[in-house]
């Protein structure tokens, strides 16, 4: 049986993401629903893809640093994801697929020869069915919020 909590890393050095060059990150600390890890990569990496687990899930990012400095923000210039971002004090993402990923545009950041991304997050696994229903609910809520904002703007 495959361990769901294994973190898989893909490095794009200009050739895209290749399954055969991906690897499972060693040394991931898991305590309860909290994961902490360091991802080491060289300055030739353009984009780093982090697959946090092999399950639909919710991630709350507690720490996310590059070479000891907080990542600039979680906008699309730096971070792309196949999850849905939920606003809050800490970045939170809902992934309704069993292949969740965060793509870090490290080429847009100041890199050294050797670099380290440090991540700490809390997670909750869920079935893809629950994830899909939650995603549809969030889509519905976001649509309703846009309608309310448009009504308020017109007044």
Residue spans of the language-model regions?
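Mature, function-bearing regions of proteins
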Residues: 84, 114-116, 122-130
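Extracellular carbohydrate recognition and processing domains
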Residues: 16-42, 83-98
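Non-cytosolic beta-sandwich-type ligand-binding/adhesion modules
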Residues: 1-28, 73-83
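Noncatalytic modules at the cell exterior or secretory-pathway interfaces
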Residues: 41-50, 109-118
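Boundary detector for helix-to-coil junctions that initiate low-complexity/charged tails
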Residues: 125-155
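Short beta-strand-plus-loop segments that form exposed binding edges in beta-rich domains
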Residues: 50-57
């Amino acid at each position: 049986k495959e361990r769901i909590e294994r973190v898989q890393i893909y490095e794009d050095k200009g050739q895209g993401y290749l399954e055969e060059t991906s690897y499972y990150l060693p040394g991931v600390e898991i305590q309860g629903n909290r994961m902490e890890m360091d991802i080491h990569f060289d300055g030739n990496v353009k984009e780093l893809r982090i697959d946090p687990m092999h399950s639909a899930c919710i991630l709350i990012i507690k720490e996310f640093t590059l070479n000891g400095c907080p990542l600039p923000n979680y906008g699309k210039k730096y971070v792309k994801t196949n999850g849905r971002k939920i606003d809050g004090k800490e970045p939170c993402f809902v992934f309704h697929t069993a292949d969740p990923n965060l793509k870090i545009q490290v080429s847009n950041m100041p890199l050294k020869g050797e670099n380290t991304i440090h991540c700490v997050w809390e997670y909750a696994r869920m079935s893809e069915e629950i994830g899909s229903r939650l995603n549809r609910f969030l889509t519905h809520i976001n649509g309703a919020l846009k309608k309310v904002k448009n009504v308020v703007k017109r007044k």
